Amino acid sequence: MYIIFSSIFAGFILGFLIRVFLGRLSLLDLEKNLTKVRVESQLEIENERRQIIANAKSQMLKEKNQQDRDIRDRKNEIVNLEKRLLQREETLDKRISALDKQQSRVDFKIKEFEQKEKVIREKEADLVKRLENISGLTREDARKIVIEKVEHESRRDAQVIINKSEQEAQLLADKVAKDILVSTMQRIVTEVSSEFTVASVELPNDEMKGRIIGKEGRNIRALETLIGADIIIDDTPEAVVISCFDPIRKELAKRTLERLVTDGRIHPARIEEVVYNVTNEINSIIQEEGEKVVFDLNIHGLDKRLIRGLGRLYFRSSYGQNVLSHSKETAIIGEILAKEMKLDPIVVKRACLLHDIGKGMESISDNSEGHAITGAELAQSCGESEIVVNAIAAHHNEVKPESLEAIVVQIADAISASRPGARRESLNNYINRLKRLEDIAYSFEGVQKCYAIQAGREVRIIVDNALINDEKSILLARDIAKKIEAEMRYPGKIKVTIIRETRVIEYAR
């Protein structure tokens, strides 16, 4: 038993020793491996260090070489710049030297010219003195004579050129205007009616006058109060005269009297009834006439106020010419002229029809010149275009025409108004206009006598030949014509004729 235990213990000891030995062997191998790994790592690290150092040295060498090359290039560039600067300095020096020489020559020539100029002035002064001694005139007198001569010759030459240009332009303008106007007038036919501010109503007998007057004048007072017209009952047999500046009220009075005379019942109540009925009739006529003229002229889109204003023109007259007929005629003429001149005929026709619309307003008198502005304001408030509004306002030159359409409206208006038989003037207006023409001519210096002839269509002026020569007579005619245009209003045109007579009388003995 002991032997067995001893054997086991001995075996255990032996096994432990063997294990220790084997462990030491393994430890030695591990140490050898560690040492080997350490050595290899150190070698590898050393190799990498050497490689890094070598690469760094190589990179530094490359950079150093590059820097050296850059430095050499910059040095070369600086050297080249210095060479160019030196060349420029040399060039500038040469130029400065040349300029200095040139300046010296210029200074020398200036001094030379100044000396020559001084000599010339001295000689000129000497010559002027000699000329003054020879001619007996001073320098200023001679200059005035030369200036007057040059001015006279220049005026004469300028007047010749102006006259020639005016003649050529007048011939061309007359031809074109005649062609257009002849073509226009051939295509228009209008009815003309002259009206007055006085109307008469025929009576069946003179007894009717008493009935119209009524007891204590009640009937005639009622008529005049309701209508606003003067009813004149005088010695005129079988007639009553109606006087009223407003043609609508005149027409109302005439129709009312005719209705009352035909009916035979004349008293204030009946008068009031008839006036009411006739007023409605006239309002209907105003509306119908306005719509009729718009339809006849094929004009669309007019405001109701404008149509009614046109209808009121049916009862109005200007210088005896019916204003609605005149407006319609002007529209037809304007449309034809617009087509001839390649303008918009619709716009021109519209403006021509409405050009006297201001006379259709109750606050404007028949021949008032303010109707143009008032009519333009009405047209603008009714939505008419700016061209139409300006044409209405400018047709009497109260404002400046801003379009060719406005000029055409003026021309068409003048053609309709100035043709023979279109208008009549009162005797006072006629005499005053002739007197005004003569007064304008007498306001100019040198006018001896003046005669307005041909119903004011021509002014013949006799001038003093000592004050007015041939050239001044042309200017005088132009100035008188301009003053007439500025201060007077008239249809058509007025001819200004200057007569200058030189009469020499000598007796043979």
From Swiss-Prot:
User: Where's the KH domain?
Assistant: 197-257
The record's top EC class is hydrolase
Q: Where in the cell is it found?
A: Cell membrane
| Transmembrane segment boundaries | 3-23
Asked if the Swiss-Prot or TrEMBL record annotates the protein with the keyword Cytoplasm, the reply is: no
Q: Can you give the residue ranges of the HD domain?
A: 323-418
Which Pfam families is this protein grouped with? Answer: HD, KH_1, RNase_Y_N
Biological process (GO), any one: mRNA catabolic process
Which controlled-vocabulary keywords does the entry list? Cell membrane, Endonuclease, Hydrolase, Membrane, Nuclease, RNA-binding, Transmembrane, Transmembrane helix
This entry carries the following GO cellular component terms, namely: plasma membrane
Matching PROSITE patterns:
HD, KH_TYPE_1
State the annotated membrane topology for this chain.
Answer: Single-pass membrane protein
InterPro entries found in the cross-reference section: HD/PDEase_dom, HD_domain, HDIG_dom, KH_dom, KH_dom_type_1, KH_dom_type_1_sf, Ribonuclease_Y, RNase_Y_N
Function of the molecule? Endoribonuclease that initiates mRNA decay.
Q: Which family does it belong to?
A: Belongs to the RNase Y family.
State what protein this is by name.
Ribonuclease Y
Species name for this entry?
A: Borreliella afzelii (strain PKo)
Gene name tied to this protein:
rny
